[in-house]
Every structure is written in structure tokens, then in C-alpha cells.
Amino acid sequence: MTASAWGLLALFLSVLGLLAWPLGRGLAAVCDGRLPGWMHRAEAPLYRLAGVRPEAGMHWRHYALALLAFNALGVFAVYALQRLQGVLPLNPQGLPAVAGDSAFNTAVSFVSNTNWQGYAGESTMGYLVQMLGLSVQNFLSAATGIAVAFALARGFAARGGDGAGHVGNFWADIVRITAWVLVPLSFVLAVFLAGQGVIQNFTAYQDVATVEATVYQDPQSDAQGQPLKDASGNPLTREVRTRTQTLPMGPVASQEAIKMLGTNGGGFFNANSAHPYENPTPLTNLAQMLAIFLVPAALCFAFGRVVGDWRQGVAILAAMTLMFVVAVVAVTAAEQAGNPALSALGADPVASALQAGGNMEGKEVRFGISASALFAAVTTAASCGAVNAMHDSFTPLGGMVPMVLMQLGEVVFGGAGSGLYGMLVFAILAVFIAGLMIGRTPEYLGKKIEVREMKLTSVAILVTPLLVLVGTAVAVLAPAGQAGIANPGAHGFSEVLYALTSAANNNGSAFAGLSANTPFYNVLLALAMWFGRFGVIVPVLAIAGSLAAKKRLPPGPGTMPTHGPLFVALLVFTVLLVGLLNYVPSLALGPVVEHLVLQAR
């Protein structure tokens, strides 16, 4: 890593810590319902209108049912908006209704906080669908994840042991998280982004004349959207020459803010945060990276306050940060080393005062390797999926690092809420392993970890690897899945593995060489996204209910401390061993083989 890369990483982590600590205090207050009187008075009409008693606790089953019903309604709403787009207002380009399979995939994607996009936003979605459908779900899906994290924190903090298993009120949680956390933060960030040059308007697209003609290759596809290939298996293209360019417009800044703060990641434009209208300057790039990690980091501090020991939250955050720093160093080093194939032709990969060096393919020159690699690690450590560079153009090992960060279960900071509850599931497993080693009934934060909790923990951990590996196997075996692979060999397999990894872990980024906007991939990835999201949330809520029903025991002489460096090391080891071991064979077939082949040339 270069000196600038180390400096950027240090600046990023320092500012993140300064911002996350006070936000953690606010999140803890929202979780506990300790809000100023005027906030309660402002909420009251909403609760009366909906017939909700916010002070009434819910059993975990009722909480889960409310959550599932709420998100299922969200899928129907977003799907309907897309299918009716042709007759809706605020569509200055007259974009038609979205195809059924793509609309289904997109609806599930945004409701599940994945924001996988098989479509190009500027040529598919009108302004009303972007605002009323996609942006609204950016708020609500993030609020859902934070609500689940709150429920699990309450399960650990509960002291009564009355057997009721109440974990809070889902409707009150959604209202408070959205109104008092996400909306204010998004407003501030949106104003900042607009001031830096991110566009915010409702005008029609602008056609402008270019200084000189542009010649490019347009990939050809059949009626089903599959890439056409020649006899050698190479994609067919046609040469296009033009002297005009269409500049897309739209209300971007308002959507960009919650896209990052909610760890959603779905771009207004196809190029996502590589587009200058979404992410114009290095300063906005830094702000967007900070926004991605802000809520996940603050939730760690909030968790410590809710359970009554701030050190517990710091230990969780320390484990996340340790793994994140290692990942940043790995991906930056891989990209800075460059492409051996180009080095063999005489290209100089060494960074100097006159060049960035390394592998600049697919990266914006205004960001360079350091900011692009850091952004890639941030967006895949969190379940965000926004990109400011094309991950498909990374070196084999550089592209493997984002994939591994997702395969760990999106617990290295992770998504808004999902990162914390995912890491707490691994913490339960870690104390169980420690209990086996010393022959004691494991405890975590005063709650005994027994058979029921371990069964639910196993389900929560194994859901996503099962979806990823089975889904990848189906895709590479099915003719419809094979047809979408444009790149042959190991990289083509990596593209499929990345897609299923991203979908099942609710990340949303992609190796964009895969033609995924087809009925086969739209349905397959939608199923992976839905069950990857709610197949984990339901067992986590069940764990929360089980813990809430138990008495909280005081620490004894044999209780394992869970706030020191030993526990942090054990937690990191557990995440790496259990979270990553499932994927070693598939990684060996994809990026590892590709790296070895590249080095051998």
C-alpha cells in the first residue's frame, strides 16, 4: 500500500469513530424509547391512525409476522409501481412498464435491502418509481434491519425472566427509526451532496453535441436478453458512431443519501457511484463511504449501552474493524500490484508522482486505486453494494476480497442492523465453543446459551451458504444460466458465484460481466435475496425471544469475559472458520485458479 492509501484509511476510521459514538447514544435512546416529549407527541397521531399501542410489547412470533407482512406488502407495492410505470406521471422520457420478471426481481431486491440491479436505472425507471417505490424501500428496509438488531439487543438486556419473551413493538420501532434516525441523517447528507454537485431535479434528459465523434462497440443480444456469441464463443458486437450524448437527469441527491446511510446501494444510474452525477468529487466519495459504515458502527456503541456495558459494543466493533483493515490492505495491495499480463508487455505498474500505477482498468481517475479499493472493501464489508469502480475489472485476488467479505455473512460492519445481529449470532457461537472447551454451560451477557439457541444459531449461519452454493450449482448446470456467462473459464464461474453471494447475503454489487437481466437469473436471484434476508431474520428474532424469556444472571468467577482482546480474537477466529470454510472449494475453482493462470502467462 502507498502512503496515500494508509493515510486515507486512517482518516476514514478516525472520522467514522468520531461520528459513530454520538449517534450510538441516540440509537440507544430510540431503542429504549427514551425520547423527548415532543417526539412522543409527534408520533401519537400515527399510532392512533394505525390502531397501534407503542408501549405494548410483542412476542417474537408476532414481531416476526408483522415484519414479514409489512415487507411482503412492500414487494407488492414496488412491483405494481413498476408494472404501471407507463401510465404514471413524473416520467419525462416516457419509459414503458418494466417487464414482469425484472419488476419482481427489483421489488424483492429493494425490500430485502439488497438493491441488486439487473437493469440500467436511467433507461428503465421513471422519477416517480425511483422516489415512491425504490427510495421509500431504501428507508423501510434499513429500518427493518435496525429493528431486528434492537429486538436482539432487548433480548440480551431483558432481566425479568417472566417467560413472556417480548422483544419490543415492530410498528413503533419502524416509525421511530425512520422518523428520528434515517430521515434526519438523510436530509443532512442530501443537502451536502447537492452542494458538492450531485444533481437534484425533475427535468427531462438533455441531448448535447460532443466535441468529436465517439465510436464504441455495442454488445448484441437476442429477444430474451441473452448475449449473442460467434462460433468461437466470443460476444458479438456492432460498431456504433455518434456525435451526440444524452445526459440523464433526476432527483439523485435525495436518493443517494439514503442509498448510503441505509446500506442499500442501488444506484440512480447504471454506473452507480462511479457516475459523476452521483459521486462527483473525492470529498463526496469519502462522505459516501462514511455514510455506509455510520449506522453499523453506531449500532455497536448503542448495543453496549442497551445491555448496560459499553465495553461489549466496543469489543464487537473491534472485531469488525480488525477484519476490515486486513481486507482493505489485501484488496489495495492486489490492485496496486497491477496486471502481470500488462507488465509482461512493458507496462510499469509502480506508483509514482506521474502515475497511479497498478490496475486502473474499471476505475475512475478522479478516485484512483486507493479510494476505489477502499470503497470496494467498505461496500462489501457492509451489505451496501454501491460501487465507484467495476469489481469485474479487479485483479483475481483483488476481486476475491470483496467476495470473501460478503461470504463471511456480511458481519464485518454489515448492513444497517443486519451487521450487528449477524455478528451477535457468531458471538453466541463463539461463547458456545469456549464453553465446550472449559466444560461449562456457556453464557453471554448473563443469558445461558442452551440447545434452543444453538439450533437457531446454526440455522441463521447456514442459510446463506446453502443458498449461495446450491444457487451457483443450479446456475452453472442449467442451460439458461450458462447462456448468461459472457466470459469463459474461471472468471465466468467467479461471476456466477459473485452474483449468488451478493444476492443471498443482501449486498447487491456484481461482477457486471454476467447477463443477469433474464427470467432465469431474475427469479433465481430474487429467491436467494428473499430467503437470504428473512431466512436469517426469523431465527434471529426467535433467539431474541428465547433470551428475553430468561433471567439475566450476574457474572460469576467462571464467567468468560466478553469484552477483552481474548474474546475479540475468539470471535474473529469463529467468523473466519465457520463463515469462510464453506466457500473454500468454490473460491479455489474461481478467483484462485484465475490468479494462478494469470501468473503463469
Swiss-Prot record:
Keyword Amino-acid biosynthesis: no
Any one Gene Ontology molecular-function term assigned to this protein's record: P-type potassium transmembrane transporter activity
Cellular component per GO, a single term: plasma membrane
Disulfide bonds: none
Topology class, membrane: Multi-pass membrane protein
Subcellular location: Cell inner membrane
Record-annotated membrane-spanning stretches: 3-23, 62-82, 132-152, 179-199, 283-303, 314-334, 367-387, 397-417, 419-439, 459-479, 523-543, 564-584
InterPro entries: KdpA
Domain of life: Bacteria
UniProt KW Ion transport keyword: yes
Main location: membrane
Swiss-Prot/TrEMBL keywords: Cell inner membrane, Cell membrane, Ion transport, Membrane, Potassium, Potassium transport, Transmembrane, Transmembrane helix, Transport
Free-text function comment from the UniProt entry: Part of the high-affinity ATP-driven potassium transport (or Kdp) system, which catalyzes the hydrolysis of ATP coupled with the electrogenic transport of potassium into the cytoplasm. This subunit binds the periplasmic potassium ions and delivers the ions to the membrane domain of KdpB through an intramembrane tunnel.
Similarity comment text for this entry: Belongs to the KdpA family.
Subunit details: The system is composed of three essential subunits: KdpA, KdpB and KdpC.
Entry protein name: Potassium-transporting ATPase potassium-binding subunit
Native source species: Paracidovorax citrulli (strain AAC00-1)
Gene: kdpA
